[in-house]
């Protein structure tokens, strides 16, 4: 599996998290988060983190938010990041996400995405 494949799969997973949070299906949400954790492990094991730091940040932050058990915040974060993998597919740039990022930070604080 290469980084492009991982990015496509993670994009699907982020969309699932957004959807399953919205419909409040805890079992399917857990499955989607488990898939993301598997891809995170693969990225770490294959030492791909330096190639996709924004993606690694999004994964780690998503799990931090999931631990807070704030469904609205998790939905909003997944909504903001679901297309982030497109950066590594050459479809978008980080700057093209400023509206999504700014909207999320306006609601939940500007500590998010500062490291990027």
Predicted features and spans:
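Short, charged, amphipathic alpha-helical segments
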Residues: 26-34, 53-57, 75, 79, ...
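Amphipathic alpha-helical binding modules
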Residues: 70-116
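Short helix-adjacent coil turns
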Residues: 23-27, 50, 69-73, 92
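Short, solvent-exposed, charged loop/turn and helix-capping segments
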Residues: 41-65
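Short terminal alpha-helical segments
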Residues: 1-40, 105
């Amino acid at each position: 599996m290469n980084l492009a494949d991982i990015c496509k799969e993670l994009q699907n997973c982020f969309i699932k998290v957004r959807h399953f949070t919205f419909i409040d299906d805890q079992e399917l949400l857990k499955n989607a988060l488990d898939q993301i954790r598997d891809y995170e492990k693969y990225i770490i094991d294959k030492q791909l983190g330096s190639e996709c730091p924004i993606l690694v940040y999004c994964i780690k932050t998503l799990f931090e938010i999931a631990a807070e058990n704030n469904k609205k915040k998790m939905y909003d974060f997944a909504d903001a990041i679901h297309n982030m993998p497109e950066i590594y597919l050459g479809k978008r740039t980080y700057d093209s996400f400023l509206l999504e990022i700014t909207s999320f930070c306006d609601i939940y604080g500007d500590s998010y995405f500062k490291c990027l």
